[in-house]
């Protein structure tokens, strides 16, 4: 199955392939960026189908805490030592962290070389690998250093998801639910009752990618519509930073963030209490956390100002006003936000 992502700059458009990895044929040097855990599960499969002139394995540490400039420098050093040039290609074999770092390294090596995403987690297949967001974290916050840089192609293998731990799978469901809650109430209703067997899992990936692709086509650089896909993330990024990226997986933090955003929406008179509870119960159904103990609501609030979506003294909150619809609010009173945060003390 193929999904086309058609961007205004036609040279940046690309295809997303589902269960068609055998199509992968490249020229020149190829660097496969992965980590030891993913390599042990999926590298053999990739090497068995990959057709190229010369291949190199670039192993990086596993974990969000290693998504930083130090790791990027390690990747770049291996590219220089191996004499990669502008005709070379990087392959991201892994989850969202691998995808983000590989894309960023590709975007800055010799001012840009090609890269291909082969996402191995549900979170990466339904979200992180599609759309061209790349980057790393630093002490000031998440993804504050990065670029928009589109892959040449994305290859999603549904069988790769069978090796995921239950917690990793749930984290991916948070991103799929995010898209359903903000853009597609029918998809949300489907997820409420679906049994995710192999067939429905493939449908979930297809539905999510189609949604993401259509949004990116309209707003590649996140000037408006695409920002809606940051629903839950304004809160999530603060949670991740406060816990040094060690307590929650990204999707888990997003699930908590969506619940927090919904509580704010209810307080503002946008979302009904019933729908906020309905969403919360679906998050719980997929084994996602919905609460986080906030020690200091004032410090939490101030951390919002390090978010990329903040403009000057205006915090852009992405808020679902009902299932299947969301708005961007930059006029939320500080006290309304603080009162919402106090619900989680």
UniProtKB/Swiss-Prot annotation:
Residues noted as binding NAD(+) in the record, renumbered to the chain: 62-67, 96-100, 120-121, 133, 142, 160-163
Function comment: Catalyzes the conversion of 3-deoxy-D-arabino-heptulosonate 7-phosphate (DAHP) to dehydroquinate (DHQ).
Catalytic reaction(s) noted: 7-phospho-2-dehydro-3-deoxy-D-arabino-heptonate = 3-dehydroquinate + phosphate
Enzyme nomenclature, EC number: 4.2.3.4
Protein name: 3-dehydroquinate synthase
Classification via InterPro entries: Dehydroquinate_synthase, DHQ_synth_AroB, DHQ_synth_fam, DHQS/DOIS_N, DHQS_C
Similarity annotation: Belongs to the sugar phosphate cyclases superfamily. Dehydroquinate synthase family.
Note on cofactor: Binds 1 divalent metal cation per subunit. Can use either Co(2+) or Zn(2+).
Subcellular location: Cytoplasm
HAMAP family according to UniProt: DHQ_synthase
GO cellular component: cytoplasm
Pathway, per record: Metabolic intermediate biosynthesis; chorismate biosynthesis; chorismate from D-erythrose 4-phosphate and phosphoenolpyruvate: step 2/7
Enzyme class: lyase
Organism lineage string: Bacteria, Pseudomonadati, Campylobacterota, Epsilonproteobacteria, Campylobacterales
């Amino acid at each position: 199955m193929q999904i086309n992502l058609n961007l205004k700059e036609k040279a940046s458009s690309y295809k997303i392939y589902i269960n068609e990895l055998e199509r992968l044929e490249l020229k020149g040097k190829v660097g496969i960026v992965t980590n030891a855990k993913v390599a042990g599960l999926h590298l053999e499969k990739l090497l068995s189908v990959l057709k190229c002139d010369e291949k190199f394995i670039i192993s990086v540490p596993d974990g969000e805490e290693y998504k930083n400039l130090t790791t990027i420098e390690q990747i770049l050093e291996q590219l220089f030592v191996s004499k990669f040039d502008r005709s070379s290609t990087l392959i991201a074999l892994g989850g969202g962290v691998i995808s983000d770092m590989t894309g960023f390294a590709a975007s800055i090596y010799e001012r840009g070389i090609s890269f291909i995403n082969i996402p191995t987690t549900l979170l990466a297949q339904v979200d992180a690998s599609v759309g061209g967001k790349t980057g790393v974290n630093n002490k000031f916050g998440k993804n504050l250093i990065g670029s928009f840089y589109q892959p040449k192609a994305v290859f999603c293998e549904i069988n790769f998801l069978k090796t995921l731990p239950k917690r990793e799978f749930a984290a991916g469901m948070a991103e799929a639910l995010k898209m359903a809650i903000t853009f597609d109430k029918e998809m949300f209703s489907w997820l409420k009752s679906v049994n995710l067997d192999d067939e429905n899992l493939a449908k979930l990936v297809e539905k999510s990618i189609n949604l993401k692709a259509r949004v990116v086509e309209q707003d590649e650089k996140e000037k408006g519509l695409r920002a809606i896909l940051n629903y839950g993330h304004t809160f999530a990024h603060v949670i991740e930073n406060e816990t040094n990226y060690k307590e929650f997986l990204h999707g888990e933090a997003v699930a908590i963030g969506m619940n927090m955003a919904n509580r704010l929406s209810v307080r503002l008179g946008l979302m009904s209490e019933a729908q906020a509870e309905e969403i919360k119960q679906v998050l719980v159904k997929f084994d996602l956390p919905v609460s986080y103990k906030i020690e200091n609501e004032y410090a939490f609030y101030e951390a919002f100002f390090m978010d990329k979506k903040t403009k000057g003294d205006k915090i852009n909150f992405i808020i679902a006003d009902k299932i299947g619809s969301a708005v961007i609010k930059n006029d939320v009173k500080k006290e309304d936000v603080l009162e919402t945060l106090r619900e989680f003390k």
